[in-house]
Amino acid sequence: MLRLVQSNTGFRSLSCRLLSSTKLVTPRFWYSQDNSKAEEIFKRKLIAREKEFRSRLPQWEKRDISLKKRYGVWNPTKKVSRVQMQDIRSLKLQMPNLKTVDMANMFGVSPESIRRILNSKWQPSENDMKKLEKRAERRKAESRERKEQSEQDLKDGVRRIHRAKTIKLQNVRYKETDAINEKDTSKKTASKRQSHAVTGKQGKMKTTIDKPFVPSVADLIK
């Protein structure tokens, strides 16, 4: 009789033996349908590996990672003026409990930029302030000139368009008047030809010229 018997090494080395009286053992295979436990174990392993990797890093790199995790990546989309920087510093001195996120929402910048402004210790001198004021005035004048130039270019373009339209309309009007004049002249010439036309012997139209009236001999003899 063919029976499956469990060997000493386990289910992997199942063998078929011909035995007369032994305990029947059927191979059982367990497949877990729930993968949540495996995912949890995998996540724990990843977290442990990440902690181990961070523990080997130097202190400055750990600080950068923590700042990126807290404030995000340094990618400024808006520049803050010097006056706004001074306002940020003074606001922080007046309200030290105010968070960087709230200040970032006020000024429309990232929290990382607020943190850098507060940590910076650079203060402009009088010469630097004069240079900054001159630069700001020059930039304002340049922007004003660009705006005026763009407005003038726009006006010139509109004028050119109107001029081209008027020229086209005048050409159309001239063409219409020329066509009307040609029609009138053709009608006049046709009427003159018909009035001066005389039929000949062969039945063809023949043009004649009107002669002045001259009295004949018959008119004199009465």
From Swiss-Prot:
Principal place of residence: mitochondrion
Transit peptide, UniProt annotation: 1-26
Highest taxon of source: Eukaryota
Organism of provenance: Scheffersomyces stipitis (strain ATCC 58785 / CBS 6054 / NBRC 10063 / NRRL Y-11545)
Protein name: Required for respiratory growth protein 9, mitochondrial
Annotated InterPro entries: NGRN/Rrg9
Keywords, ordered alphabetically: Mitochondrion, Transit peptide
Gene Ontology, cellular component aspect: mitochondrion; nucleus
Gene responsible for this protein: RRG9
Family to which this protein belongs: Belongs to the RRG9 family.
Task of the protein: Required for respiratory activity and maintenance and expression of the mitochondrial genome.
UniProt keyword annotation of Transit peptide present: yes
Region (Disordered): 120-158, 177-207
Subcellular location(s) of the protein: Mitochondrion
Bias kind Basic and acidic residues: ranges: 127-158, 177-187
